């Protein structure tokens, strides 16, 4: 499965058409938050309508909580707090972020994040249908793609799922675009879509094939 991963468009979709064109023939798009820049929620429809492929989406900390209703009513699949099975790949989503110093609209406590994810990840681990488990979060795990000049700011709750899932696609920290592998888990931050950054991720359903990641700029 070829996945187009985008994050942090912040309501500026001026680069999206070029991103989609350059990505070429992909199977699925995932949008991992900050779809808007504190609203309006109606921007969701504008973004979703740009794709002619399925879209899984979660909100970011700069989205209003009311965006969940807009996502439900859009062409995109609202994956916040939910799981979706596509072939042998289980996608698990949780939007918002761990607490920030800025009191942004969609923040969750570390306890809320852990409680929301544990049941879904455990279910996927115990399912014979899941060849690959993909976690879509806006916030990165603590210690991976989360570094700012003053230290690591990722979620310690999400960190607990490293080595339990195969792939984490996250955003939030604009400066941390890139990928790294911790245990068996590949962590990908596709960069700011509003600046023309994205990532193409290829997941083979056959066992033991490595996850391939290619970053693009337009």
Give names to the regions the model predicted.
Residues 1, 27, 53, 130-132:
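Short coil/turn segments at beta-strand junctions that form active-site/ligand-binding loops
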Residues 2-10, 88-97, 134-138, 186-191, ...:
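Active-site-proximal beta-strand elements of phosphoester/diester hydrolases
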Residues 6-86:
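Core catalytic region of metal-dependent phosphoesterases/phosphodiesterases
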Residues 8, 29, 34, 60, ...:
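Divalent metal-coordination and catalytic microenvironments
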Residues 10-15, 36-41, 61-68, 98-102, ...:
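Active-site environment of divalent metal-dependent phosphoester hydrolases
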Residues 15, 84-87, 108, 156-164, ...:
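Binuclear metal-dependent phosphoesterase catalytic core
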Residues 51-55, 131, 164-166, 184-185:
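A short helix->loop->beta-strand "cap" motif at the edges of active sites that frequently abuts
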Residues 63-157:
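Conserved catalytic scaffold of divalent metal-dependent phosphoesterases
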């Amino acid at each position: 499965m070829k996945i187009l991963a985008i994050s942090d468009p912040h309501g500026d979709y001026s680069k999206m058409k070029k991103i989609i064109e350059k990505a070429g023939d992909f199977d699925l798009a995932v949008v991992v938050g900050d779809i808007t820049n504190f609203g309006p929620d109606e921007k969701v429809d504008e973004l979703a309508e740009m794709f002619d492929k399925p879209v899984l989406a979660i909100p970011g900390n700069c989205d209003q909580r009311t965006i969940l209703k807009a996502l439900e009513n859009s062409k995109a699949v609202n994956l916040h707090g939910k799981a979706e099975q596509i072939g042998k790949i289980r996608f698990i989503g949780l939007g918002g972020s761990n607490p920030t110093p800025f009191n942004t609209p969609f923040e969750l406590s570390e306890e809320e994040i852990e409680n929301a994810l544990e049941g879904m990840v455990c279910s996927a681990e115990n399912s014979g249908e899941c060849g690959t488990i993909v976690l879509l979060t806006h916030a990165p795990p603590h210690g991976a793609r989360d570094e700012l000049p003053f230290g690591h700011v990722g979620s310690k709750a999400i960190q607990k799922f490293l080595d339990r899932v195969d792939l984490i696609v996250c955003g939030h920290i604009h400066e941390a675009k890139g990928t790294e592998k911790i245990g068996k888990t590949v962590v990908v931050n596709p960069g700011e879509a509003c600046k023309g950054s994205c990532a193409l991720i290829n997941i083979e359903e056959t066992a033991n094939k490595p996850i391939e990641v290619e970053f693009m700029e337009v």
